[in-house]
Amino acid sequence: PFIRVMDSLTLAISQGSLRRGSAAIYIRVDHPEIEEFIELRRPTGGDPNRKALNLHHGIIIPDEFMRAVENDEEWGLKSPKDQAVIRKISARSLWIRMLSTRIETGEPYFLYIDHVNKAIPEHHKLAGLEVKMSNLCSEITLPTGIDKDGEQRTAVCCLSSLNLETYMEWKDHPTIVEDIMRFLDNVIQDFIDRAPDAMERAKYSAMRERSVGLGVMGYHSFLQSQNIPMESVMAKVWNKRIFKQIKEAADAASVTLAKERGPCPDAGEYGVMERFSNKMAIAPTASISI
């Protein structure tokens, strides 16, 4: 019923004429209601009053669960309040159900939380920060909650996309990625300066991390323009070549901007010369593709 309230809110909120409100909800794979949660967006079967067809949903999966699936073990569903095991089910059966629903409906998202936290920036590990969940489309993995200074953080997405359909036109441009990273740095600074006080936690998080997400759009259009099948070896070669180029340029831009404008506070505290804690995010691009 609480999820249904959020479901109704997304229908009531819109961003002008661009797109209506949207939200994603995440629960851990050991939550007692995980089986019903998996079917949240399936339009048929179950109580229609407990469906939420306008929300996106994701499952937070620790390594422990995947080990249980691998070994065909029982999996304990725990109370969120005191972590007491309420009942046990087959991990493998639950995994099959998750995969089947994802194949049929496209969701839920899977967030491999232990892997995510192993891959966060080193200065965030040193600060004891932790990623607890993801965002609307599961491409953002930023820390939330109370940090070492006792401040509450709310993650902020500051995104932009390179158009790969025109990759051949800009691939040799020496500063295109750096220019976009400068643009994103200016955008996040504008948010920090102008956002209302009601967004204080988000402003604080953006100020400390300066995390941005440079992504891409038009990858399939690029392959079509080159007459390359999506699942071919050549598509994989282009994929690695393009993203290697973008990543290296984004990393270099972060260092350059740190020297010019100073490192972000999270990195600077540990002597790391990085303007951005996070630099890339491959987000869905439905709205900007039209």
Language model features: what each stretch is:
Residues 1-5, 15-130, 216-264:
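Conserved, charged catalytic cores of large soluble enzymes
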Residues 134, 287-290:
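Gly/Pro-rich active-site capping loops and adjacent beta-alpha segments
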Residues 18, 179-203, 207, 211, ...:
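Internal maturation/activation junctions in enzymes
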Residues 29-31, 161-163, 284:
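Short, structured patches in soluble enzyme cores that scaffold and shape functional sites
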Residues 13-14, 24, 97-100, 146-148, ...:
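Generic recognition of flexible, low-complexity loop/linker segments
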Residues 7, 11, 36, 160-161, ...:
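Contiguous, well-ordered alpha-helical segments that form the cores/surfaces of helical PPI scaffolds
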Residues 1-2, 13-16, 102-206, 216-222, ...:
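Function-dense linear segments that define catalytic or interfacial modules
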Residues 23-26, 66, 74-76, 108-110, ...:
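Structural motif
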